[in-house]
Amino acid sequence: GGFMSQDHTGYENDEGYESDIDEKTQEQAAPAQPTLDTADDGFSFTPASSTQSTPAISTLSGTISTDDQISDPITKAVREIIIQQQKDEIAEQILKDLAALVDRDLAEQKRKEIEEEKEKDKKLSVFFGNPANREFIDNALEKPELKKKLESIEITGYKNILLTYSAANGYHGGFKPVQWENQISASDLRATVVKNDAGDELCTLNETTVKTKPFTVAKKDGTQVQINSYRAIDFPIKLDKADGSMHLSMVALKADGTKPSKDRAVYFTAHYEEGPNGKPQLKEISSPQPLKFAGDGPDAVAYIEHGGEIYTLAVTRGKYKEMMKEVELHQGQSVDLSQIIAEDLTKVQGRSQETLQPIITPNQELKSSIETPTTTQVPPITPASQPVHTETSQMPQSQQVNPNLFNAATALSCSMQDLLNYVNAGLTKEKDGNTQIDLINEAATAILNNEKEKQANFITLTKNMVNNNALTPDTKVARVNAVLETIKNNQDTPDIEKSKMLEATVAITLNSENLTPKQKQQMLEKAVDVDLSFKDDTSRAVAIDGITGAVIKSNLSTKDKGTMLIAVGDKVNASELSNAEKQQLLGSVLKKGVETKILSPEQQQLMQQNLDKITAEQTKNDNITEVQGILANPAFNTIAKTAAIQKVTTKVLDSPITAEIKGETLESITKIVAESPLNVQDKTDIVKGMGEAIASHRTMAPTKKIAAIESVETGVAKSITDLEDKKLMTKGLVDGIYEDKANPEITSEMMKAVSKGVDNSTAIPEDKQALKDAASEAALDRATQNFTEGLKGQNLDEPKPRDDIYNKAQDIAYALKNVVTTVLDANPEKREVSEEEVMNKTSSILNDISKIAIEKVNNLRAMLSPDSNLKTLEEKKAEATKKVDELVKEFGTKSSTEEQQSFIQANLIDDKTLSKEVRLQTIDKLLQEQAQKRAEAIKNPNVKTEDLRVVSGQSALKPISNDEPDIEKTKMVVGRDRVNIKDNIKIMGALMNARDSI
């Protein structure tokens, strides 16, 4: 279980081993070419032992047997080589996480718990078995670097186990392929009888292939994948025929039902260990993680995402549960993380379960996911008498070497000097460049595959090449680069060890007297390339530090050293690494270059500019990621989301990044908001909040505010969403701008910026005009609203202090620019006007607006936008009345109570595009209708029965059904009534609730 959950469960290369042995018995032939051998199902069977085995382990459950107990050799090997190393790595990561934990008391408690248990039990069984620690384990497993370490442990560990326990390698009862009978096409059934080496039957496996029920699942990135064919194997639960231990490993199938190549294969494995009576017992299940099921029913098939592809496993949910019960029975306690199948992990939509039509959403997976990347493995160098058998189809061309050259390993087995003699003789004899590269690769691979003095021997080989006078300088560059490529592809040498070799190679080449600076730079750049391909950031950082140190310590001139450091920086800058890591690596190179006075001021400036660009890009991405998190946070309501995104907006405005990056960031944030699945009112509120945050910023220059508003509207206009939604969000932005009443002139400029933002999009002219009209309409509404608020409580006939009225006159002058001519504009030469004149003019303007408000607003609308067909207040009222009548009429067409309730919910509560006034008027009309209907029913003597009086509360209800007396009684009573009183009450209640919610 658990991190036995890997894809390399022990069987993927069975056929490879067999064919390897076969080939070794043949005469020397042409070199073996890489093949696309498909993976196959495998099994192993170990005869009964004289000692009883123990329950199998479960990685994180604390069920590992004690050291003095003897277990099945394969399980024991997995335990020691893979699982314990993984647990140590996980524990280390948890300790790192605890160091950063805010709750210091809890962190210290957990740290002590781990440290103290380590002293008693290196396996940390209790810690990993405690459900309370699940959160710490899950958090650790989310770290990409830890995942890579765990995967690396598994790859190396399983590789060793496969070699040791393969039947093809002579291990008695070792792994071999399952031989299925020919498939019976009519029913898609096939079977096989599994036998041990003595020919005794162990069990019969039945396999059913399903091609008639395709279903769709979603990958992590949201991509939908259709599964057209999958299979289910009836794994045995009890084995009572032959004694011993057995391991069944079934390869996962691709989405089309075919088997993958061996270098991509993953497996579902059942481990049956010898029990007290000698018979195999099901004690362990290994599978890749996270394991998911295509539905909730017993026939739902298991599947996983691995290396970006979807694979189905040969087990159904029902069979898996059955197997897990048996595992629990023999282990005596629950199984670990990998075996948990919480009901909420799968979500089925569309057709019913029987038709297997689920959609599994990407976030519904176990956090403790461990997936192994596809790896390219370099084959070991074998003596010349044996042809090479390459294991994967992805071997670089340079690895396919002529077998006649393969004497390097034999030479190295005598001494390093013999190897050098062999290489030098070959280089002198062979003038073909490719053959020379093959020869050097062979020697380098022999060194890397030999654990003894690996690093020292590698340095000796590099020196030999650089100083070999038989090679031209350009040839030396090609040969050294080929050796560096061999280092890169070697899977058996840890990255930290490789980094030392890179440092040494750079030092040797830079100090060489017979290479030009350009040739030295080419080799340096290749070394950096190899370093940047390392699996984890620590190894990469160590290697870059080593290479930087080698440049600084070299005998190059200061100028050439500076050029080399810039070359290192350029390689890092152009890499695919994260911005955060680029910052770290570039910063380190720059710091050392400055401290040692190697980098010139110009070079320092160039590297600093690259760093600044990365920092800006990182800041932008961080802000965008933060907004995505806010939008997706289920704990945040709209108010909280708006406040949080306002904070992000302010943070962007205050950050030291360039105006260009600020604009891109604000545009991206707005576009994400606009395209989010939130309802349009929520999105409008958030955009309004962004507008307010920009307009009300107190220290920002007006020109920068204007540019920021333009970027936000560009994000709205460019978003892929409905035009009506864009119009509402544009209005929201204008509302946000008007929330700040500090400077009407700046407000006016920001309104122009909204238009520019619209123009930045690629929308059709009609849509652009519609957005601009929406902005104008919102601006006019806000200006009118501000006037109305200013008029409240004013008695314009009473004298007011000069300042109060003068200020109001100024406000109106700004707001009605190009619309109303004020005393200030009419008399530019007459700045010294009397208080009375100002008061009279202002009073006149305010009176005009307040007395004939409707007329003024209509005129203002027409003057502000004569071409944009804005509606007058009367037109809006008429439209509203018409809409109310339509809604009331449509409600009348709904016959059942359920339909009427649905109508109320959809049209009067959920539909935010309708104004509050329309919805409230509709509710009032419908309430009047319902009250009228009820009144008519009461007044009509023909239907005024005793039953009706019972419902009216004039006599007591008598129970009819003990289960639901009131409901049954009501049904009986109103069945005789022309107006269904109960339903009438329901509808009135629903309408009143709707009114309250508005």
UniProtKB/Swiss-Prot annotation:
It comes from the Bacteria. It is found in: Cytoplasm. GO terms for cellular component: cytoplasm. Coiled coil: none annotated. Signal peptide: none annotated. Residues 46-68 have a biased composition (Polar residues). Its main location: cytoplasm. Residues 12-21 have a biased composition (Acidic residues). Keywords: Cytoplasm. InterPro entries: Rickettsia_antigen_120kDa. Pfam families: 120_Rick_ant. Residues 1-69 are annotated as: Disordered. The keyword Disulfide bond does not apply. This is Antigenic heat-stable 120 kDa protein. The gene is sca4.
